[in-house]
Swiss-Prot record:
TM annotation in the entry: none
Disulfide bonds: none
Protein family (similarity comment): Belongs to the UPF0434 family.
A Pfam family: Trm112p
InterPro entries: Trm112-like
GO CC terms of this entry: cytosol
Protein name: UPF0434 protein BBta_0300
Length: 65
């Protein structure tokens, strides 16, 4: 499946970002394009994005400050 021409292949679909929440807190996520992560401030976790796919598993998340 190819990404639309108006966004890079490794980016996440904006519509998907609107509906995703942190699996731990059910709170909002912030997209960090530079690090390719979804940030949950309330859980203090950063979920990785691999090949444009968010990995929403707490055991795969990186702890943040």
């Amino acid at each position: 499946m190819n990404a639309p021409l108006d966004r890079p292949a490794n980016s996440v679909d904006p519509k998907l970002l609107e509906i995703l929440v942190c699996p731990m807190t059910k709170g909002p996520l912030e997209y960090d394009a530079a690090k390719q992560e979804l940030i949950s401030r309330s859980a203090k976790l950063a979920y990785p994005i691999r090949d444009g796919i968010p990995i929403m598993l707490p055991e795969e998340a990186r702890k943040i400050g």
